[in-house]
C-alpha cells in the first residue's frame, strides 16, 4: 500500500492515527534542526515533521523539491500558533519512515512560479502540478460529468462519429490525412460532426449528443485551438423554442455543478437589436452602457464633421457612462475607434456645466441630450458619427467593451446569459462576389421568397458574458429547400453532389424536422475557471502558432513513410506523387 490517505484528507479527527502518505515534496524548511516538509498531491498539501531523533531524519536531509516520496507517521494536532488556512492546517504528521520513490532533477521552474507560457507548455508535466491548473481540470471534469448527467436524464444517446471523413470545407481549412491504401486520396479530420449528426436524425435517433473533437486549420487566438472539444447535440421533432428552453436548463445545470448560478430565464435579442444596442452579436451586457441613437439632436448642426455625415444619410450614436474623462483619455479612445474605421470621437461630461472641447460648436445639441436622458453631474457621453451604420455600431461596441473591462472590472464576477436569434441567413463575400451561408448551408431559412439580403435564419447563439458558448439552428429537412440553398450560394448541382452527395441522398428517404446546437466546451470551462485563455483548461494545448511545445509536433517524418503515402516534399509545399503502377 502506497497510502492510507491523500494529502488533502487528514483533519483534527484523525489525530493519533498511524498513516501512510505519498506525494511530491513541495517545500522543505529547517527550523532549529527540525525538518518541516510540505507534501503535495492533487488533493492538497500536508505538513510533515521530521525530528532529529527520528529514524527518517538522515534520509530527510537528502530530499529535494519535486522528489516523490512515501512517508509513515502519526497524525498530531498542531500548536494553535502554527495552525494555517490549509484544509489540513490543524494537523501535521510526525514522520518515522521515509521511502524515496523517485528523485527529481532541478526543474526549469517550480509549480506555481510565474514563467513564460512557452516554458509552461514545454514542461507541461511540471505546470500541471500547479494547484491552479489542477483546479481547472477538475472543473472541466465536473462540467463534463454534469453535461452527461443532464443529457442522459433527458433521453439523449451518446454516439461517436468518425474522425476520418470526407473533406467538406466549412469556412476554415481542413486538416488532411493521406490514405496509404487509396493512393492520392485524402481523409479530412472533421471541423464538426454536422452532417453525421443530421444523418443520425434521418436514422431515427431522435436525441443525440457527443463530446466531439473538432479540427480546424485556422489562425489562432486566445480562445481558439486547432483541435478543440464541442458538446454536440441534435434533436428531432422539435421547434426552435423547445431547443432554446431545454438548452437553457442544460447550461444552468452544468454551470450550477461548479457553483455558478445562471439566470432563471435567458433574454432573447435579435441580431439587429444586439448590433444596435451593443455593437456586437456577442454582447456583454454586464456593463450597461447601451448604444443610443443621438442623430435627432444634431439635425440642425452646422458643425462640419457631423453635418457632412448627416448629409450622406449617416448617423450619430454613442453611449452614456460615468468614467473619469480627460483630453488624454479621450485621445486614447479616439485612436482606438479609428482602428475600426471611424474618423474620430466626440465627448462631453456634465459638471456644473457641460465640459467638452467641442462645446462651443455643439453645446445646444449636448444640452438636449442632457435634458432628454436626465443626466446627472458626473455623466460622460462618448459619441461618433459615420455614414456606415455597421462601422459605427461595431466601433462604438468595441469602445464600450474596452471601457467596461477597464473601468468596471468589479462586474467580472457577474454572470449574464442570453440568446441571439434572427441572424441574417446569408452574408456577402466581397472577394468572390457572391452570397454565402452565414452559419452553414444546412440552416433552415425563414423565408426564401424575400430579397436575399433580408432573409433571416432559424439560427441562435447562446452568449455568456460576451462570449459565444453555443451556436446552432433548425436544419433543412426538405431536399428541395436544400437544393435551392445550394443554388443561392453558388453551388452547381454537380458541385453540391461532389461535396455533399451522401447527405443529399439521405434527404430523399424520410427526414424528421430537426435542429441542434454545439457548445464550445473549452470556452465554457474557461469562463467557469475564470481564465483568459482556453489553453489553461486543456491538458495539452497547442501554442498560438499551432505547435505542441511538449512533443514538438508537427514534425518531419521519415522518407519511407512519405513513399508509402505517395507524397513528395518539395520547397514550398507538398506534392502528391501519383503512382501509376
UniProtKB/Swiss-Prot annotation:
It catalyses: tRNA(Asp) + L-aspartate + ATP = L-aspartyl-tRNA(Asp) + AMP + diphosphate. ATP binds at residues 216-218, 225, 468, 520-523. Residues 194-197 are annotated as: Aspartate. Gene3D superfamilies: Bira Bifunctional Protein, Domain 2 (3.30.930.10), GAD-like domain (3.30.1360.30), Nucleic acid-binding proteins (2.40.50.140). Its EC number is 6.1.1.12. InterPro entries: Aa-tRNA-synt_II, aa-tRNA-synth_II, aa-tRNA-synth_II/BPL/LPL, Asp-tRNA-ligase_1, Asp-tRNA-ligase_1_N, Asp/Asn-tRNA-synth_IIb, AspRS_core, GAD-like_sf. Keywords: Aminoacyl-tRNA synthetase, ATP-binding, Cytoplasm, Ligase, Nucleotide-binding, Protein biosynthesis. It is found in: Cytoplasm. GO terms for molecular function: aspartate-tRNA ligase activity; ATP binding; nucleic acid binding. L-aspartate binds at residues 170, 216, 439, 475. GO terms for cellular component: cytoplasm. One of its GO terms (biological process) is aspartyl-tRNA aminoacylation. It is an enzyme of class 6 (ligase). It holds the Pfam family tRNA-synt_2. Belongs to the class-II aminoacyl-tRNA synthetase family. Type 1 subfamily. HAMAP family: Asp_tRNA_synth_type1. Homodimer. Catalyzes the attachment of L-aspartate to tRNA(Asp) in a two-step reaction: L-aspartate is first activated by ATP to form Asp-AMP and then transferred to the acceptor end of tRNA(Asp). This is Aspartate--tRNA ligase. It comes from Thermosipho melanesiensis (strain DSM 12029 / CIP 104789 / BI429).
Amino acid at each position: 500500500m502506497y497510502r492510507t490517505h491523500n494529502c488533502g484528507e487528514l483533519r483534527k479527527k484523525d489525530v493519533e492515527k498511524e498513516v501512510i502518505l505519498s506525494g511530491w515534496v513541495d517545500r522543505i524548511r529547517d527550523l532549529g534542526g527540525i525538518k518541516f516538509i510540505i507534501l503535495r498531491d492533487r488533493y492538497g498539501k500536508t505538513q510533515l515533521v521530521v525530528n532529529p531523533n527520528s529514524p527518517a531524519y538522515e534520509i530527510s536531509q537528502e530530499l529535494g523539491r519535486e522528489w516523490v516520496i512515501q512517508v509513515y507517521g502519526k497524525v498530531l494536532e498542531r500548536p494553535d500558533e502554527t495552525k494555517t488556512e490549509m484544509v489540513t492546517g490543524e494537523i501535521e504528521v510526525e514522520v518515522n519512515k521515509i521511502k524515496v520513490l523517485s528523485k527529481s532533477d532541478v526543474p526549469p521552474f517550480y509549480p506555481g512560479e510565474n514563467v513564460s507560457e512557452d516554458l509552461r507548455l514545454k514542461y507541461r508535466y511540471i505546470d500541471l502540478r500547479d494547484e491552479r491548473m489542477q483546479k481547472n481540470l477538475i472543473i472541466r471534469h465536473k462540467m463534463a460529468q454534469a453535461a452527461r448527467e443532464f443529457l442522459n436524464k433527458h433521453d439523449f444517446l451518446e454516439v461517436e462519429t468518425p474522425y476520418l471523413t470526407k473533406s467538406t470545407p466549412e469556412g476554415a481549412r481542413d486538416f488532411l490525412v493521406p490514405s496509404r491504401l487509396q493512393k492520392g486520396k485524402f481523409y479530412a479530420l472533421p471541423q464538426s460532426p454536422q452532417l453525421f449528426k443530421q444523418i443520425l436524425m434521418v436514422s431515427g435517433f431522435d436525441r443525440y449528443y457527443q463530446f466531439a473533437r473538432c479540427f480546424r486549420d485556422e489562425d489562432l487566438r486566445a480562445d481558439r485551438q486547432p483541435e478543440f472539444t464541442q458538446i454536440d447535440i441534435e434533436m428531432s421533432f422539435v421547434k426552435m423554442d423547445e431547443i432554446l428552453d431545454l438548452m437553457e436548463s442544460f447550461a444552468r445545470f452544468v454551470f450550477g455543478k461548479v457553483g455558478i448560478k445562471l439566470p432563471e430565464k435567458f433574454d432573447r435579442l435579435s441580431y439587429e437589436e444586439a448590433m444596435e444596442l451593443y455593437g456586437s452579436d456577442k454582447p456583454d451586457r454586464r456593463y450597461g452602457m447601451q448604444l443610443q441613437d443621438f442623430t435627432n439632436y444634431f439635425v440642425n448642426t452646422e458643425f462640419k464633421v457631423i453635418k457632412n455625415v448627416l448629409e450622406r444619410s449617416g448617423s450619430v450614436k454613442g453611449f452614456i457612462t460615468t468614467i473619469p474623462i480627460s483630453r488624454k483619455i479621450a485621445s486614447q479612445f479616439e485612436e482606438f475607434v479609428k482602428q475600426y474605421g471611424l474618423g474620430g470621437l466626440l465627448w462631453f461630461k456634465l459638471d456644473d456645466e457641460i465640459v467638452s472641447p467641442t462645446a462651443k460648436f455643439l453645446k445646444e445639441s449636448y444640452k438636449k441630450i442632457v435634458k432628454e436622458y436626465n443626466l446627472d453631474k458626473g455623466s460622460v457621453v462618448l459619441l461618433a458619427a459615420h455614414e456606415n451604420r455597421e462601422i459605427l455600431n461595431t466601433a462604438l461596441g468595441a469602445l464600450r467593451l474596452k471601457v467596461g473591462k477597464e473601468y468596471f472590472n468589479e462586474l467580472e464576477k457577474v454572470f449574464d446569459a442570453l440568446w441571439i436569434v434572427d441572424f441574417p441567413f446569408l452574408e456577402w463575400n466581397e472577394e468572390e462576389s457572391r452570397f454565402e451561408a452565414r452559419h452553414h448551408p444546412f440552416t433552415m431559412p425563414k423565408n426564401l421568397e424575400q430579397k436575399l439580403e433580408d432573409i433571416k435564419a432559424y439560427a441562435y447563439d447562446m452568449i455568456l458574458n460576451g462570449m459565444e458558448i453555443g451556436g446552432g439552428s433548425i436544419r433543412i429537412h426538405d431536399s428541395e429547400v436544400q437544393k435551392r440553398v445550394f443554388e443561392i450560394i453558388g453551388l452547381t448541382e454537380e458541385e453540391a453532389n461532389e461535396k455533399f452527395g451522401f447527405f443529399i441522398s439521405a434527404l430523399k428517404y424520410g427526414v424528421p424536422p430537426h435542429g441542434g446546437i454545439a457548445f464550445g466546451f473549452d470556452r465554457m470551462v474557461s469562463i467557469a475557471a475564470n481564465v483568459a485563455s482556453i489553453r489553461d483548461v486543456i491538458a495539452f494545448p497547442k501554442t498560438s502558432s499551432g505547435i505542441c511545445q511538449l512533443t514538438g509536433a508537427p514534425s518531419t517524418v521519415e522518407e519511407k513513410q512519405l513513399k508509402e503515402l505517395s507524397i513528395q516534399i518539395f520547397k514550398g509545399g507538398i506534392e502528391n506523387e501519383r503512382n501509376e503502377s
